């Protein structure tokens, strides 16, 4: 399926309203979370059946406020860390202002529960001046940034003003508690961060809300962008039919999704 480039209007310099991004993963729309498949392979279908298309549309329209007749600018991609690349491109183009609110609809938190864990960000990245943190290509080169921790990097880059995590009912506990303050909000903190606070400024507290039951979620307002990841190692190939369903709500710039 080919997606044509569309023009996304530039935001005005005077805009002060916090922008909002809806960030979805295909694995949210499964009966249960899949174990991570080997590179080049997909999880098996039994126990991980995809939702019916009608249920996906009901969630997107009734709870996220999306419409097929007025799709939002965005992108479909293979792995979820490409959301970070997309956001940085939109910021550079003057279409997205940071920090922005993120609604993360995903079976996983993507906050770094697996290797290399949160410590690289807490002790290495937080020692850097904020402009240097934005060099995400360097973190890719070091094999530290991936689809399981890109949101943690986005937080360290101070791109996110608030984060909602809408989870699959069968999601496993994967939110690193070290990232949370006493109120359950995200506050990246470490001895390293404290040592460099005079130079880098204090790390912001980011309001964080978790919806373990997605039925409790209702979008607080309209979204400016929608991104959607297929995450093939986390979803069986039988779920790929939902890519086109979700794609009806996204005004694609270009075909960034191989094989969609």
Pin down the residues of each PLM region.
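Short, Lys/Arg-enriched N-terminal segments with co-localized hydrophobic residues
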Residues: 3-18
């Amino acid at each position: 399926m080919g997606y044509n480039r569309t023009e996304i209007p530039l935001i005005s310099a005077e805009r002060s309203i916090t922008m909002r991004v809806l960030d979805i993963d295909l694995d949210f729309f499964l009966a249960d979370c899949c174990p991570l498949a080997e590179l080049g392979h997909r999880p098996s279908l039994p126990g991980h059946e995809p939702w019916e298309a009608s249920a996906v549309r009901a969630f997107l329209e009734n709870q996220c406020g999306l419409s097929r007749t007025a799709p939002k600018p965005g992108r479909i991609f293979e792995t979820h860390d490409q959301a970070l690349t997309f956001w940085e491109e939109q910021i550079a183009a003057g279409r997205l202002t940071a920090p922005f609110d993120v609604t993360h609809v995903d079976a996983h938190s993507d906050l770094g529960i697996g290797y290399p864990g949160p410590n690289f960000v807490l002790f290495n990245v937080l020692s850097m001046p904020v402009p240097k943190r934005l060099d995400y290509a360097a973190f890719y080169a070091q094999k530290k940034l991936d689809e399981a921790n890109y949101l943690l990097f986005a937080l360290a880059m101070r791109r996110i003003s608030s984060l909602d995590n809408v989870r699959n009912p069968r999601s496993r506990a994967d939110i690193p508690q070290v990232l949370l303050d006493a109120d359950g909000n995200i506050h990246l903190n470490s001895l390293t961060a404290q040592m460099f606070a005079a130079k880098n400024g204090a790390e912001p507290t980011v309001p964080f809300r978790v919806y373990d039951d997605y039925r409790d979620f209702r979008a607080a307002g309209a979204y400016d962008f929608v991104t959607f990841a297929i995450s093939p190692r986390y979803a069986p190939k039988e779920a790929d039919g939902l890519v086109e369903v979700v794609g009806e709500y996204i005004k694609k710039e270009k075909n960034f999704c191989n094989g969609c």
